[in-house]
Design a protein with these regions (language model features):
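Hydrophobic transmembrane alpha-helices and their immediate junctions
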Residues: 279, 283, 403-445
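Membrane-interface helix-loop-helix junctions at transmembrane boundaries of multi-pass membrane enzymes
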Residues: 52-57, 102-118, 243-257, 292-296, ...
Length: 507
């Protein structure tokens, strides 16, 4: 409760100012000192303090930090090392989630366990047990793997407890604005130049996935990878679309302009998977808004993808950007790469067949190794800490679950896939407002990427949004059960003895 004469909004603004000053100050100190250790030493106690005093504020801030994590790592000199991450700033996000989880456990107000919550709990238990799997190449690989597989899912439980309607909308607006900022920075990288700190990172990491040939390098904006950038733009595009249906929003011309910038950045980033998932999510959200049946919603989503392929074929057939700007321009190379992959997703120049094959191999490996290879076998922990494991992650969740958790992982994941999509659809139908569409849209935009902890800014966000949606739905169901009117039962029938007068029932 706010003190007398001081509104909650003013306290929230003051808290934001304190966090901003402390973060910028520690960033400048680390810049001068040439090490990330100082930044982490200053920031982590601040994160813990905010988590205990105002968890909702920290949840609202989390998207900002996760989006700018890659930028901070590149802009400031590195230095230092820690056992689990190699860069101390990487543990700030996991620390925030762990402390928020402790706050969640120590406070009341979480709704009763739903069917989805029970499945997620089973997933968490399996992830912890798989830490001890010897096939991943050591205990350190398993513990490190928890940072990518287990810790992001803590946001589900945090969302169930603290994901109120107000908090969820604040997070949504932050994600929308951040996607616009990231899109503008990514377009600057793509069509103007890469700043010196980004060029240094490209050269030092030798990131071959960024190179499209003809001297064209993919943009990655403020993120740690081009894939993370693309997935976040996809989520941002869905959020902007849902916010357009909200009563309180930006003026429509500005709103549409923001959506256009994000969509252009997503297109020119040239990641086909995110384009397909964006079309799928938009189709599903549109059908859910019309309150169609589940099968019709699925058909709408698939139809949106088909329309995308047909439209891309029409543009590509006409020469696309090459006709306007020349075949060697940056825009033409990016557009032709994108359009060729969309119109012929299984062609020789597409990476989709390879991803599907790797996913299929990963799923079938669950039958050869029923207990999997461990929590750290499909993420960065394997390359950093594993001593014997040679397994690698696939592009999609089913393959990763088959490799990491074996047959149990596959069963739990497909149960989770069913329960999560069902919850998102039911929330959208029951609430009849943009908030339900938001949860369903984010689920679809990140489909088959839910356990990819390498997507720092996206993975935890998906789990928080899903947890918040599940919590809202569970509370609504509980309120309905409490408010159902009691039905009076008719008196039990008894036989009348011979000669006994009739009894008049009193109502």
């Amino acid at each position: 409760m706010a003190p007398q004469g001081q509104s909650s909004s003013s306290r929230g603004g003051r808290s934001w100012l304190i966090v901003l000053v402390a973060t910028v100050g520690s960033l400048l100190i680390s810049l001068v000192a040439g090490t990330h250790v100082i930044f982490a030493v200053i920031t982590i106690p601040l994160v813990i303090s905010i988590a205990w005093s105002s968890p909702e504020l920290l949840i609202t801030i989390m998207p900002v930090w996760m989006v700018f994590l890659g930028f901070v790592r590149r802009f400031t000199p590195g230095g230092g090392n820690v056992t689990f991450s190699g860069d101390p700033v990487l543990i700030i996000g996991p620390v925030a989630l762990i402390v928020l989880m402790l706050v969640t456990v120590n406070t009341r107000g979480a709704p009763p366990l739903s069917k989805l919550a029970r499945v997620v709990l089973g997933f968490n238990i399996v992830a912890i047990l798989e830490v001890a799997n010897p096939k991943q190449g050591g205990l350190m690989a398993g513990v490190g793997g928890l940072l990518f597989v287990f810790v992001p899912t803590l946001a589900f439980w945090i969302g169930r407890r603290f994901g109120s309607v107000d908090v969820l909308w604040r997070v949504a607006w932050n994600v929308a604005i951040l996607s616009l900022v990231a899109a503008l920075y990514g377009l600057y990288q793509q069509f103007v130049q890469f700043p010196s700190w980004d060029l240094t990172w490209i050269e030092s990491k030798g990131y071959t996935a960024l190179n499209l040939g003809s001297g064209i390098v993919r943009a990655f904006s403020t993120f740690s990878s081009a894939q993370e950038y693309a997935v976040f733009l996809s989520v941002g595009l869905i959020v902007w679309s849902v916010l357009a249906a909200k009563s309180v929003r930006m003026p429509l011309p500005l709103h549409l302009a923001a959506m256009t910038v994000v969509a252009l950045a997503l297109f020119y980033e040239s990641q086909r998977t995110s384009i397909f998932l964006s079309a799928l999510a938009l189709g599903v959200v549109m059908a859910a808004r019309l309150r169609m049946r589940p099968i019709t919603v699925a058909i709408f989503g698939v139809s949106a993808v088909v329309v995308l392929v047909v439209f891309a074929g029409a543009i590509g057939g006409g020469g696309g950007s090459a006709a306007l700007q020349g075949p060697d321009s940056t825009a033409a190379v990016l557009a032709n790469h994108q359009l060729s992959g969309i119109t012929d997703p299984t062609g020789s120049g597409s990476s989709l067949p390879g991803h599907i094959k790797a996913t299929r191999v990963g799923m079938f490996s669950a039958f050869k190794n029923p207990f999997g290879h461990g929590s750290g076998s499909t993420n960065l922990a394997a390359s950093r800490y594993s001593t014997t494991s040679k397994t690698a992650g696939t592009e999609f969740d089913p393959g990763n679950m088959g490799i990491a958790f074996g047959i149990f992982g596959l069963i739990i994941y497909f149960l989770m896939l069913w329960r999560m999509t069902a919850m998102g659809y039911r929330l959208a139908i029951v609430r009849r407002d943009p908030l339900g569409l938001l949860v369903l849209g984010v689920i679809m935009a990140t489909l088959l990427q839910w356990t990819n902890g390498n997507l720092y800014s996206v993975c935890w966000l998906l789990w928080f949004v899903v947890g918040a949606g599940d919590g809202l739905l569970s509370r609504q169901d509980a309120e309905v059960d409490l408010t159902l009117p009691s039905v009076e039962t008719a008196p039990a029938f008894t036989w009348r003895k011979p000669g006994e007068p009739r009894r008049v029932a009193r109502i």
